[in-house]
């Protein structure tokens, strides 16, 4: 008897979680590791949100809720879309799930079949291709270029479209690059989605974490026709430092949301009741802490980009949003340390961890090998020391 399914055997653990686990294991041994691997804000959840959760507990709001979320939270999400994006939705067009990843997974299971193709620009968030594959569809990877700000061009997108194209995955601002699409960029994607009849899955989880006065535009807001073809994947995790609360949400066509609700009813059922109440406060309560977090992230971004670009042989694109940089280390490929040659980003990441005691995530996991992802969701002190360690380690490569 075969123990594991082919589906299970086809999967590997999330590389970002694996890197963090290795770094924590070293730290447990007393080794001082500086981690740039985190995919979550280093700030605490704002106090008003925590108090809303405490109130929910004290009032006994600890039972099952409707599968797709409580009406109060759906209304808060609807209010958020109207306020921030000039988008109008009904409760039946909103689904609350156990995090943004769960939202994407539900969506993939609801709309993809064997033979469908899903266009994913690279660099991409590590979980997109596996979740598409788990739904028996084929991820079609389209490479982007550093000189274009890691954004897919209309020409490259057009080349990837076939009669089997079911959806295009848009992540703006992006994990891992921090690139963000302007309204003008999005209008070109809209034209192709409508003319070639495919869905746009818009992951907007980093919407509020943007810099230099960038104006975020939700692609669904551009016209009614594209809104019908767009499914927005969102959540409270990044904006409100609520990664552990596990609340994501989806907005889209009623038929799709209903199917996702059915899938969720047979898997997790409802998201945590207490987290739902906290998320209501996050979305409709005061937003003071968000601005403070973004301001701190922007200061860190400015420092880390400037510092990386001063390291010989390293180039770092300046991100527009999120809290990651994606520097290019290709000039160090082919060099060696103690007989071991660096010929890909995985070996370089291992080198940084073993020699510099710095954890980064190899770019190959995001579909872009010459790069490493560094999160600046950590203290300025750690950023300074971590980059000093990286620079010193690189000097040892010959």
What positions do the PLM features span?
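PLP-dependent class I/II
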Residues: 2-4, 12-14, 19, 26-32, ...
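Substrate/cofactor-recognition hotspot
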Residues: 8
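Generic structural signal for well-ordered alpha-helical scaffold segments
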Residues: 24, 78, 82, 108-109
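A glycine-/small-polar-enriched, mobile loop at the entrance of the PLP active site in fold-type I
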Residues: 37-40, 55-73
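Conserved N-terminal alpha-helix of the aminotransferase class I/II PLP-enzyme fold
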Residues: 64-97
């Amino acid at each position: 008897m075969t123990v594991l399914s082919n589906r299970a055997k086809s999967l590997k653990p999330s590389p970002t979680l694996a890197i963090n686990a290795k770094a924590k294991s070293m730290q447990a041994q007393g080794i001082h590791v500086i981690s740039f691997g985190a995919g979550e804000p280093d700030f605490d959840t704002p106090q008003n949100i925590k108090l809303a959760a405490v109130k929910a507990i004290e009032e006994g709001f600890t039972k099952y809720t409707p599968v797709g979320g409580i009406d109060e939270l759906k209304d808060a999400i609807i209010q958020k879309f109207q306020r921030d994006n000039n988008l109008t939705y009904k409760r039946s067009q909103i689904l609350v799930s156990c995090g943004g990843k769960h939202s994407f997974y539900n969506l993939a299971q609801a709309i993809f079949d064997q033979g469908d193709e899903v266009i994913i620009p690279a660099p991409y968030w590590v979980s997109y291709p596996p979740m598409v594959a788990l739904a028996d569809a084929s991820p079609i990877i389209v490479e982007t270029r550093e000189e274009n700000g890691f954004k897919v061009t209309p020409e490259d997108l057009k080349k990837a479209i076939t009669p089997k194209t079911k959806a295009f995955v848009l992540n703006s601002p992006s994990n891992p690059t921090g690139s963000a699409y302007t309204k003008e960029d999005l209008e070109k994607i809209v034209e192709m989605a409508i003319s070639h009849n495919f869905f746009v899955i818009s992951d907007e989880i980093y919407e509020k974490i943007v810099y230099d006065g960038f104006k975020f535009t939700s692609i669904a807001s551009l016209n009614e026709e594209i809104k019908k073809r767009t499914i927005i994947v969102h959540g409270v995790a990044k904006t409100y430092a609520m990664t552990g609360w596990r609340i994501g949400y989806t907005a889209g066509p009623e038929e799709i949301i209903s199917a996702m609700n059915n899938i969720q009813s047979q898997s997790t059922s409802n998201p945590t009741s207490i987290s739902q109440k906290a998320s209501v406060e996050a979305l409709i309560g005061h937003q003071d802490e968000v601005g403070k977090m973004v301001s701190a992230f922007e200061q860190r971004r400015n420092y880390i980009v400037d510092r990386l670009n001063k390291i010989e042989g390293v180039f770092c694109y300046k991100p527009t949003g999120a809290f990651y940089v994606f520097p290019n280390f290709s000039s160090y490929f082919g060099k060696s340390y103690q007989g071991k040659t660096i010929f890909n980003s995985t070996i370089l990441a291992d080198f940084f961890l073993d020699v510099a005691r710095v954890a980064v995530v190899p770019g190959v996991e995001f579909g872009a090998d010459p790069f490493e992802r560094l999160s600046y969701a950590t203290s300025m002190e750690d950023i300074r020391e971590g980059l000093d360690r990286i620079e010193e380690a690189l000097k040892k490569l010959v």
